[in-house]
Each structure stands twice: as C-alpha cells, then as structure tokens.
Amino acid sequence: MSTLFVAGAGTEIGKTYVTAALTRALRASGRPVRALKPVASGVPDLSDPDFSASDTALLLAAQDLPVTPETVAAMTPWRFAAPLAPDLAAAREGRSLALADLVAWCETAIAAPAPGTAVLIEGVGGLMSPLTAEATGLAWLKALRLPVLLVSGSYLGAISHALTAIETLHHHAVDLRAVVVSETPGAPTPPETVAEAIARHAGVRVLCVARGGGFPAEGLDVVPA
C-alpha cells in the first residue's frame, strides 16, 4: 500500500509545506499522487480571498487541481472556521467529529485511487493535538495503521519537541519512515543543525526541507512503493 501519514511534532511547523513539496516531487518523478487533508481548522470560507492560502488550497495547487466546492470537499471534508483544535472548533460550530467516521473516510479514500498511486494523508496540529472529544491525532494515525513521516520545525525547542514525538511513536510501535525538518523562518539555528541533532539522539533518518526549496530527491523512498 503506497500510503503515508504526515504528522507534526507541533502545530504550524510546516506539515502542509512538506506535504505539498513531497507531492510535487513525486509527480515530477512520474508517480501519480493523491494528497489529502481530511481535517482542518482555521479555514476561511471558499468565497474569502484568504482561502487561497489555506492548507487545502495549497495541496490542491500541488496536484494541479482547481479550487472548486467539489475538490475542496473531496480534499478536506471536515473544515472548521475557528483556529482551534478540531474538537473545540467543531463544538463552536455546533458540530461533532467522530474518530470512527474519520477513519472510515480515510480508508475509502486510500482504496479509491488506481494501483501505484501514492496517497498522502496530512494530519492536523501536532501528534498529540486533540482531534475529537476522546481522541488525539496519535489515535487517528494508529487506527489507520499507516507508516508516518514526522515533520519538525527548526525553531528554538524543536529538537526537544521532535525527540518527544519520536519517543511517543516508538512507544506505540508506529512505523516511522523518517523525520523532516522544515525550516522555520527567522529561526536562530540552521535546519541542518537541528536535523543532525535529532538524528544523533534518536537514531532515525532525518531530511531537511528549506522554505522556498523542494523535497529532497533522495527522500522520495519515504513513501512505500
């Protein structure tokens, strides 16, 4: 199964940038890709000009897909306006989000593309961010039983956050394919230095993605064949 879950060591650290970069790199290599962001908070209305900067719009652009009500719904069926954890954002709108429904939707989406298509599922928030009233992002990816690409930033404190997330994934026997350090604009430490420290302490494969740069070609094998 050519499916990868893109998780974050924290919130707003570059998951979508990395997912979009990986999508473009895979497509450039000749591999068909379907990238999905099933849940998103802080999403403007489709009629709002700011929607073009949303995670959903960025992933559609990486696949050369137009922004329409249909493509948006197919990419991100659970969209919430408030920039809060999904369970809180849903409650504010009088809605609910059930883990079983989310997992079922993802399983259907994974099975839909033609054989050989790489399916990327981007999580929401950090690894332990509340997802529903009872479940976290970790529970979601464990239920899907998918290999994981963990995204870290390069900000001050990113090394500790990444090592904590790696330890959590290992404790729960999750297949961690690699860590990607996504450059944090204005960070005092180069992403390569952060990546070296994470690799040294955790003994895992670590890649770097610079802001304005693409996904490294040598890292495309993080997506199972």
Curated annotation (Swiss-Prot):
Which positions bind ATP? E12, I13, G14, K15, T16, Y17, D55, E122, G123, V124, G125, S182, E183
Q: Which residues bind substrate?
A: S41
Chief subcellular site?
cytoplasm
What gene is this protein a product of? bioD
Reaction catalysis annotation: (7R,8S)-7,8-diammoniononanoate + CO2 + ATP = (4R,5S)-dethiobiotin + ADP + phosphate + 3 H(+)
Q: Which cofactor does it need?
A: Mg(2+)
**To which species is this protein native?**
Methylobacterium nodulans (strain LMG 21967 / CNCM I-2342 / ORS 2060)
Q: Which UniProt keywords apply?
A: ATP-binding, Biotin biosynthesis, Cytoplasm, Ligase, Magnesium, Metal-binding, Nucleotide-binding
Name assigned to this protein: ATP-dependent dethiobiotin synthetase BioD
Q: Name one GO biological process term.
A: biotin biosynthetic process
Q: Name one GO cellular component term.
A: cytosol
What is the stated purpose of this protein? Catalyzes a mechanistically unusual reaction, the ATP-dependent insertion of CO2 between the N7 and N8 nitrogen atoms of 7,8-diaminopelargonic acid (DAPA, also called 7,8-diammoniononanoate) to form a ureido ring.
Q: Where in the cell is it found?
A: Cytoplasm
